[in-house]
Amino acid sequence: MSDKAAGETKNGNGATTEPSLNILAQYVKDLSFESPGAPLSLRPREKAPSININVNVNANPLSETDFDVVLTLEAKAVDGKDILFNTELVYGGVFRIQGIPQEHMLPLLFIECPRLLFPFARQIIADATRNGGYPPLMIDPIDFAQMFQQRMAEEQAESAVKS
């Protein structure tokens, strides 16, 4: 029987480390907003434009405990064949993760970390579209757990094809 508490791990010095997730920094890596048809595209419209949104999450280790998690949001508003605006945000966060078992790291990096970044990224996109002369684009909350499950299923399918 072990006297190690659930969720605690040993650090390199043999001392136990409580599970923790800390945001060390958040930053805009890239932000672009294009309104190719302005000012004509800013006129009132009879119907709402079609808005396509793409979301991507990547994570890279910076050290044994620090990770760079990057959330990419792309939005394009189209009315017929006219592009009203196109915006892209690459928003990152540096996270310090300690005391988390290895089997929980991927879900933490690809679900919890982007969930923490999303409200800030959403506000930046809303401000960019508003500052571009359009109503603020308020992106609906994103189900990062579903995105992660889909990503894992795609990777398993790819590895099965390669085998």
Curated annotation (Swiss-Prot):
Q: Which domain of life is it from?
A: Bacteria
Q: Which GO terms describe its biological process?
A: protein folding; protein tetramerization; protein transport
Ordered alphabetically, the record's keywords are: Chaperone, Cytoplasm, Protein transport, Translocation, Transport
Does the entry feature the keyword Transport, yes or no? yes
Q: Where in the cell is it found?
A: Cytoplasm
**What is a single molecular function from GO for this protein?**
unfolded protein binding
Instruction: Look up the record and report any one GO term of the cellular component aspect.
Output: cytoplasm
Pfam families reported in the protein's UniProt record: SecB
Q: What family classification does the UniProt entry report for this protein?
A: Belongs to the SecB family.
> What does it do?
One of the proteins required for the normal export of preproteins out of the cell cytoplasm. It is a molecular chaperone that binds to a subset of precursor proteins, maintaining them in a translocation-competent state. It also specifically binds to its receptor SecA.
Per UniProt, subunit arrangement is: Homotetramer, a dimer of dimers. One homotetramer interacts with 1 SecA dimer.
Protein name from the UniProt record:
Protein-export protein SecB
Native species: Brucella canis (strain ATCC 23365 / NCTC 10854 / RM-666)
